[in-house]
């Protein structure tokens, strides 16, 4: 839910925002933003066919999830997946956006390399959970974006699911997945640490209901606004 909530935060700050769900094999943004029933339509411009993106909370969204049955396993080889992604990127009728957030799957595979080669990325934000096995993925991600042939600025790291605070014990923090692994790595390699996001029930409920918790939960909105302000300041 980080991408959806971050996008909505940027929108509440007055920016025009679009989201491209680049997680071809496991798209979720259309569900998180309440657009599951959207049926894409096409339009022509200058003799070229374009897809009209979904509109949700005054944001634009394009996802492969609009074109597949949610119960079907997507068994595409790498070339087929990357070609689909190129179409979603280049043949969507995006409006005049200030930010296009591209939600990528974990790892450093074909999807990431396709995005890097197809569009000039202004920066990468890497999301991790605190445990060491997750931080190992962060290490690979940072190294990929920093590679001399890639050279995409790493704007920072977000630590998601950082701790849990029960309502009945508001002064207690329980570090269920370990403590501060992503923060420690960010400090070690000189990458900005953008902030922590705790485990909050409203975030999970919002992901399921299609209503991001930003704008509903003031505590969650505060976490995301601090992160969004740091990202904007770095660009």
Feature-to-residue mapping (PLM):
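Hydrophobic positions on the alpha1 helix immediately C-terminal to the Walker A/P-loop
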Residues: 2, 6
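Phosphate-binding/switch loop-helix module in NTP-utilizing enzymes
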Residues: 65-115
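C-terminal boundary of histidine-terminating zinc-finger modules
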Residues: 207-220
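Gly/Ala-rich phosphate-binding loop of Rossmann-like dinucleotide-binding domains
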Residues: 7, 11, 116
């Amino acid at each position: 839910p980080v991408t959806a909530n971050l996008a909505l935060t940027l929108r509440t700050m007055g920016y025009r925002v679009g989201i491209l769900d680049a997680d071809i094999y496991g798209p979720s943004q259309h569900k998180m933003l309440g657009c599951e029933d959207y049926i894409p339509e096409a339009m022509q411009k200058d003799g070229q066919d374009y897809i009209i993106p979904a509109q949700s909370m005054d944001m634009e969204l394009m996802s492969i999830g609009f074109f597949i049955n949610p119960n079907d396993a997507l068994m595409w080889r790498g070339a087929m997946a990357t070609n689909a992604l190129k179409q979603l990127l280049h043949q969507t009728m995006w409006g005049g956006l200030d930010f296009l957030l591209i939600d990528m799957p974990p790892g450093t595979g074909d999807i990431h390399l396709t995005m890097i080669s197809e569009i000039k990325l202004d920066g990468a934000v890497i999301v991790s959970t605190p445990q060491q096995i997750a931080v190992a993925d962060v290490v690979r991600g940072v190294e990929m974006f920093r590679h001399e042939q890639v050279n995409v600025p790493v704007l920072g790291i977000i630590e998601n699911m950082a701790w849990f605070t029960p309502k009945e014990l508001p002064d207690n923090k329980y570090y269920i997945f370990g403590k501060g692994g992503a923060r420690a790595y960010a400090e070690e390699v000189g990458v900005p640490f953008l902030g922590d996001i705790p485990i909050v029930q409203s975030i999970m409920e919002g992901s399921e209901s299609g209503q991001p918790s930003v704008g509903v939960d003031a505590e969650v909105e505060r976490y995301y606004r601090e992160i969004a302000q740091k990202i904007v300041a770095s660009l």
